[in-house]
């Protein structure tokens, strides 16, 4: 794998640190008036998703991580594993609950997902940025009830709960941003 120096760190770069893969989220190269230059880097640990801030000297280097992002189609969940398929080779891949994590509530059958592999094993699953889900349960919105925040909780077909505007009713299909878990719009 390639070696990267701290001044080569860019957002999206995946590096190895302490024997684990990390993704660079932000990097700021600082040249102080006195002293050695350094890079202030924000990293995300790919195995757990935790964020770390670290300072590297300009002479520090890191090995590139052998991490592959693949576009796979979500098939089904058998209770223990989530199954995905490569649309070109029709090869199937199974990811455990740990790899899917909180994103399980956004997985729909036949949805295109990005599965991150490290040493051939899935370590994270990223659903599409937007999904369209049906509301299966929400309180009825009362006309003129705008004293509150203007929102109410709604349970979706996958079990996720999001805050929606008062005019949205049970049975409607809504568009949700999976990155923030927020309501975007109604689907016509």
From Swiss-Prot:
Residues that span the membrane, as ranges: none
Molecular function (Gene Ontology), one example: translation elongation factor activity
One Pfam short name: Elong-fact-P_C
Sequence positions bearing N6-(3,6-diaminohexanoyl)-5-hydroxylysine: 34
Post-translational modification: May be beta-lysylated on the epsilon-amino group of Lys-34 by the combined action of EpmA and EpmB, and then hydroxylated on the C5 position of the same residue by EpmC (if this protein is present). Lysylation is critical for the stimulatory effect of EF-P on peptide-bond formation. The lysylation moiety may extend toward the peptidyltransferase center and stabilize the terminal 3-CCA end of the tRNA. Hydroxylation of the C5 position on Lys-34 may allow additional potential stabilizing hydrogen-bond interactions with the P-tRNA.
Compartments (UniProt record): Cytoplasm
Family per record: Belongs to the elongation factor P family.
Function in brief: Involved in peptide bond synthesis. Alleviates ribosome stalling that occurs when 3 or more consecutive Pro residues or the sequence PPG is present in a protein, possibly by augmenting the peptidyl transferase activity of the ribosome. Modification of Lys-34 is required for alleviation.
NCBIfam families attached to this UniProt entry: efp, PRK00529.1
PANTHER family for this protein: ELONGATION FACTOR P (PTHR30053), ELONGATION FACTOR P (EF-P) FAMILY PROTEIN (PTHR30053:SF12)
Name the UniProt record assigns to this protein: Elongation factor P
Lineage: Bacteria, Pseudomonadati, Pseudomonadota, Gammaproteobacteria, Enterobacterales
GN (gene name): efp
């Amino acid at each position: 794998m390639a070696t990267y120096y701290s001044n080569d760190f860019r957002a999206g770069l995946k590096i190895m640190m302490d024997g684990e893969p990390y993704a660079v989220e932000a990097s700021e190269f600082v040249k102080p008036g006195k002293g050695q230059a350094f890079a202030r880097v924000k990293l995300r640990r790919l195995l757990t998703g935790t964020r770390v801030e670290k300072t590297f000297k300009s002479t520090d280097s890191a090995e590139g991580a052998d991490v592959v992002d693949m576009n796979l189609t979500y098939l089904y969940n058998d209770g223990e594993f989530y199954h995905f398929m490569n649309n070109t080779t029709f090869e199937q891949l199974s990811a455990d609950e740990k790899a899917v994590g909180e994103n399980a509530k956004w997985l729909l059958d036949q949805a295109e997902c990005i599965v991150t592999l490290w040493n051939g094993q899935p370590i994270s699953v990223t659903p599409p940025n937007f999904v369209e889900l049906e509301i299966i349960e929400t309180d009825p919105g009362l006309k003129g009830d705008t004293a509150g925040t203007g929102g109410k909780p709604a349970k979706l077909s996958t079990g996720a709960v999001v805050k929606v505007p008062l005019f949205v009713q049970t049975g409607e299909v809504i568009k949700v941003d999976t990155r923030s878990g927020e309501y975007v719009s109604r689907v016509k």
